[in-house]
Amino acid sequence: MGKPPRAMTPVEEVDLSAVRYQSPSLQAPHLTGFSLRAFVWLMESPLFGRLLTSVLKSQNNITRMLQDTVIPERPMYLPEYPPQEPEQGVLLLGDDRDPVDRVEEALHCLPPYDPSLRWPAGDKPPFLYWKIRDFAHAYRSGITTPSVVAEHIIAGVEEWSNKKPPMPMLVYFNADDLRKQAEASTKRFQQGNPISILDGIFIAIKDDIDCFPYPSKGATTFFDKIRSVEKDAVCVARLRKCGVLFIGKANMHELGLGVTGNNPNYGTARNPHSIDRYTGGSSSGPAALVSSGLCSAAIGTDGGGSVRIPSSLCGIIGLKTTYGRTDMTGALCDCGTVEVASPLAASVEDALLVYSAIAGSRPMDKLTLRPSPLCVPNLVSPDNNNILGSVKIGKYTEWFHDVSDRDISNTCEDALNLLCSSFGCQIEEIILPELEEMRTAHVVSIGTESFCDLNPHYRAGKRTEFTLDTRTSLALFGSFTSTDYVASQRIRRRIMYYHNEAFKKVDVIATPTTGITAPEIPQSSLKLGESNYVVSAYLMRFVIAGNLLGLPAITVPVGHDKQGLPIGLQLIGRPWGEASLLRVASAIEELCLQKRKRPSAFHDILNA
């Protein structure tokens, strides 16, 4: 007679005081070069593949969690949120309003622009990224034009593409098209008719989001041949309507199936703070472009930390919106349950402006998700400091400090303490059970959904055209069963319950964004790729709730480790609570502004 299955306690009956944090222990080989090629052959082998995936799942408790456990909750296939209380001190933008009008409204929520603070005379000021309003001022005052800035960008892209080692931030770049866009914007300024504050602002688009007439390859070598681009994705169309100029399609981890940014197809994007290290991924190119100064913002996708991880590693802002807050129509990954399109930016202010333009749920999501009204924080409200002072920040201390080096968590803790001492916020201890179950449920959810999307092409003979890293992931994802998927959705309901309970006592949850700073790029990974699930697990340690539960989250740079590598602090918010996150993030950014450092690979496109 077999061993009886493990039975989970109904989620409402779990005693939080009895929960003990357990640091995850992921078991998987680190592979590059020939060893990775051999491993992929074994994983795809009909004879050995099933055995190997079975061993990997057993070693990492996936089988025990999903096959040998009774989970009493019913599945949650899409995030389900209770009605939310209205946010304080916000300006309603209107989900269906013209993006130009929304951006104009959002502009009034920002502190007045003072050129003397941004363009100081005399001594060289500390390093600051140029903001969208700096470009707008420069265009309107005749300091420069979009066409001049476009030439600086073109020179920067060409310079870094020809460096040794190269810094391949873009997979598709057309200098003539960029000049054409910039010329049209320059004429609008000359005629006194700029469209919005975003007119003439250069933005990059991740290669899994449609931006006509560029192809969308997902950084593969073939996807543009089987899927044509006929028009802009909805988020891109909204930006274009505001006058945004598109640099091109940004590099990424192939099809978003990795978080380092490694890509043998087009070259691996390199971290502007240390070019021998990864940017993080999968939005590697967008993060590198913003961090290096080549654009103020970029649009990426985030299904497993893919906006927040590279933003943290590259020392910039990364906003992950609530699932369904942005319309995913026109993205390669628009059918899943964990992914969103979101901005990466040099500042919280710029993230807020870009978010104001791209936000707006699609009709189907309005019916099923019932989003709260779209709004942004009024940062010039007389009540702003009082609202900040009332914020309660949740911190699960044992989890918070489970990082590769305490430099990371201590730096994040210092930023939180500075916020509390400056505004009177309170830090509350919380407990979030079943974090390892959450990780497993996310892997199965995003993996199964990705495999479902790619399997027809995989079976149609495209298997060998994927990178070895992608093929490793797909071989594992293809081994997940319907039982695994349904069990994962039952876990999703449990994890949602725990977070909803936490949000009854706190307003935001704070963690380090990643459990490790930017890892080194192995030389052996450049041609054939790399599979390193242990490093990936460190990078993803704190980001998963944002995806499995669809919660909004933002990463803010708060300092550097002993090697000078950026450290990001993550804030996770209530459903539809982007405005509250942006308010707190703006305060933290201001408090930590002097800690930001100029990347070693940086191009000043406004003051060149």
Swiss-Prot record:
GO terms for biological process: defense response to bacterium; lipid catabolic process; N-acylethanolamine metabolic process. Its EC number is 3.5.1.-. It catalyses: N-(9Z,12Z-octadecadienoyl)-ethanolamine + H2O = ethanolamine + (9Z,12Z)-octadecadienoate; N-hexadecanoylethanolamine + H2O = ethanolamine + hexadecanoate; N-dodecanoylethanolamine + H2O = dodecanoate + ethanolamine. The keyword Membrane applies. GO terms for molecular function: N-(long-chain-acyl)ethanolamine deacylase activity. It is found in: Endoplasmic reticulum membrane; Cell membrane. Catalyzes the hydrolysis of bioactive endogenous fatty acid amides to their corresponding acids. The hydrolysis of endogenous amidated lipids terminates their participation as lipid mediators in various signaling systems. Converts a wide range of N-acylethanolamines (NAEs) to their corresponding free fatty acids and ethanolamine. This is Fatty acid amide hydrolase. It comes from Oryza sativa subsp. japonica.
